[in-house]
Structure formats: C-alpha cells, structure tokens
From Swiss-Prot:
Example GO molecular function: G protein-coupled receptor activity
Main location: membrane
Cell cycle in keyword set: no
Topology Cytoplasmic: residue spans: 60-75, 131-149, 220-269, 328-373
Bilayer topology term: Multi-pass membrane protein
Full protein name: Probable G-protein coupled receptor 45
Taxonomy, superkingdom: Eukaryota
Originating species: Mus musculus
SUPFAM superfamilies for the chain: Family A G protein-coupled receptor-like
Subcellular localization: Cell membrane
Length: 373
C-alpha cells in the first residue's frame, strides 16, 4: 500500500494499492524472527519509557535539579517517551502481523510524529553540545534556566515546522507491508526529493557536523587545560611560599583540578550520547536518502529487511540515553533507588553525613549552571 499527495495538489498518487500488500509468508523475515524483534521492541518501549520517565520526575520533583542543562536533558527524555508511546507500539504490531491495521491517514500521522519527536531530540542534543562548547572552549556560561526554557520552546516549534509538511503531503510515504512502518518512499518529483533532503539534513547531517566540530574543539581545550594544570604544579617552588600562601595555593590547585575533572566527566557523558546518536541514526539517514532517490534500492527484495533493521536501530536511541544516565550520573542512580518501592531496595541507604566521611568529594555541590552529568 502507498499513500501520497503532492505539494501543490496538481496530481494524486494511488492511496491504496492491493498489489503491494504482502502475505505474512512472503516477507523476507521468518515468523520467529519477526516475533523476536517485536518482543525486543516491546522491551525497548518499557525500558525507554521507565528510564526517561525517571529523568523527567527527578527534574520535576527536585527544584535544585532544575538547572539549564537538566531542563534540556528532561526535554530530551520527554521526546524519547513520546516516541516510545506514539510510534514504537504500532511498528511492533506490524512486525508481527506484516499488515498495517490503522489506515493510511494514521500511517502518515505516525510518520510525522516519528520525525517530529526525533527532530526535537536531535535539537536538544545539539543545544547541549553547543552549550558545552561555550562553557569549556569560550568560557561563556550564559545559558540559565529561563533562557533554556525559551530555547526549548523554540526547538519544539522548529521541529514541528520541519516535520509537519510530511503529513500534508510534501513527500511520498510508503505504507506497510513493504516496510514495518510508514517510511519515505521513492519519488521522482523534485519538490518531494528536496523535502527529503531537507528533512534528513536537519535530522542528522547538519547536527552531526556541528556537534563533531564542537567536540573536537572541546577535546583540544580539555587536553590543553590538563597540560597547563600539570605544568603549573611541576613549576612551583614550595620553599618560597609561606604557610598561608601554601594552603591557599593548594586550595586553588584542588579547585582547578576539581573543575577540570567535573567538566571532563560532564563532557564525556554528552560525548557518549553523541556517539550513540551517530551510530543509531547514520544508517537511517543513508537509508532514507536511498529510498527517495534510488529506484533499484527501493524496489529491491531486501528493502523490507533493511527497513526493519534501520528502524529498530533508530528506536534503540530512546533506550540508550537512560542507560547512559544510569551508568554515568550518580545522582540519577540515587534517584532511581529512591523511586523504587522499599520492598525492592536490597541495600540500606547510607546517611549523607557518613557518605561525606567515606567520600570527602561529596562536599562539592553543583550550582545551578552545572549539571549532574
């Protein structure tokens, strides 16, 4: 089946084409494999929903956690939640049945929502990357919670403006069963191809280029800072310092080392998110361009299998983010333990006073311009 309408309404494509409907036995994927992929996708829905919900709850319930960067992370989590709820269940059902049971109009709507929430997530990741660049490289920490909220609102509007034309008919959409989800289809019309290029560039290639340049600059700055701190420590003549001066210098060195360690750890967390985004979305971006421009690829026997793999990989990003948070962010792990019912908490909680004795670095508290990452 295929659904499509033109940008100017001067021609119409066939909305329903029975000849494109595949029987379950005709799909390149065997029934056990389809069911396994669907079950894995259902697990991804559960993990992605619960993990990202915890992020939103932490930021909502704790005023101290409502820094600019944490508001951005909560927005990223919310976009992943909506992607898990609005798109993934229908793809899982279609994987099992090899038929789209929700109509061609809802197919186009689901594809629009898919691109909408993906665009928002990418926009937030891009904003976080630029913010880290300004803080570490340019030493400009101008993003406060108020500005972050304004930028978040603007990103939602921009994501909607870019994704909405796909619902109104600015590109050709393929309805399953040729793919397990409504995807960009092959077209020879220049306007439709131009929109596909715009969409893919906005989702992946432009953000990837900006983030890659930002991270390379950050890596270079962090390396230089580490060398400078090390050289300053080696060049000191402690015999020329008084007792008070020595204590003050040691405090300055400790603070500089702590700030460098904090920024490096925060940057490493964001860098891991960037790597996950790149691995999950590079195949999908190439696949989308080939679908729109290559007739041979689009009508090949392997198109259904390729569609299933790249869609499954793109959804994996929604699960990847909360796993990274749990792995890298101590406050996130602590909040997860606190949110668990008491019957599931195996280890008793250590009082904060004792934690400070065990780990003196816990006295370092982030201000509102720093994050828990």
């Amino acid at each position: 089946m295929a659904c499509n309408s033109t940008p100017m309404g001067t021609y119409e494509h066939l909305l329903l084409n029975v000849s494109n409907t595949l029987d379950p036995g005709d799909t390149p994927l065997s029934a056990p494999l389809r069911i396994s992929l669907a079950i894995m996708m259902l697990l991804m829905i559960v993990v992605g929903f619960l993990g990202n919900t915890v992020v939103c709850i932490i930021v909502y319930q704790r005023p101290a956690m409502r820094s600019a960067i944490n508001l951005l992370l909560a927005t990223l989590a919310f976009s992943d939640i909506m992607l898990s709820l609005c798109c993934m269940p229908f793809t899982a059902i279609t994987l099992i049945t090899v038929r789209w049971h929700f109509g061609d109009h809802f197919c186009r709507l689901s594809a629009t929502l898919y691109w909408f929430f993906v665009l928002e997530g990418v926009a937030i990741l891009l904003i976080i990357s630029v913010d880290r660049f300004l803080i570490i490289v340019q030493r400009q920490d101008k993003l406060n919670p108020r500005r972050a909220k304004m930028i978040i609102a603007a990103s939602w509007v921009l994501s909607f403006c870019i994704s909405a034309p796909s619902f109104t008919g600015w590109t050709f959409m393929e309805v399953p069963a040729r793919a397990p989800q409504c995807v960009l289809g092959y077209t020879e019309f220049p306007a439709e191809r131009a929109y596909v290029v715009t969409l893919v560039v906005a989702v992946f290639f432009a953000p990837f280029g900006v983030m890659l340049c930002s991270y390379l600059c950050i890596l270079n700055t962090v390396r230089k800072n580490a060398v400078r701190v090390h050289n300053q420590s080696d060049s000191l003549d402690l015999r020329q310092l008084t007792g008070a001066g020595l204590r003050r210098l040691r405090r300055q060195q400790q603070q500089a080392s702590l700030d460098l360690s904090f920024k490096t750890k925060a940057f490493t967390t964001i860098l891991i998110l960037f790597v996950g985004f790149s691995l999950c979305w590079l195949p999908h971006s190439v696949y989308s361009l080939l679908s729109a421009f290559s007739r041979r690829f689009y009508y090949s026997a392997s198109f259904y299998t390729t569609s299933t793999c790249v869609l499954w990989l793109s959804y994996l990003k929604s699960v990847f983010n909360p796993i990274v948070y749990c792995w890298r962010i101590k406050k996130f792990r602590e909040a997860c333990i606190e949110l668990l019912p008491h019957t599931f908490q195996i280890l008793p909680k250590v009082p904060e006073r004792i934690q400070r004795k065990i780990q003196p670095s816990t006295i370092y508290v982030c201000n509102e311009n720093q994050s828990a990452v």
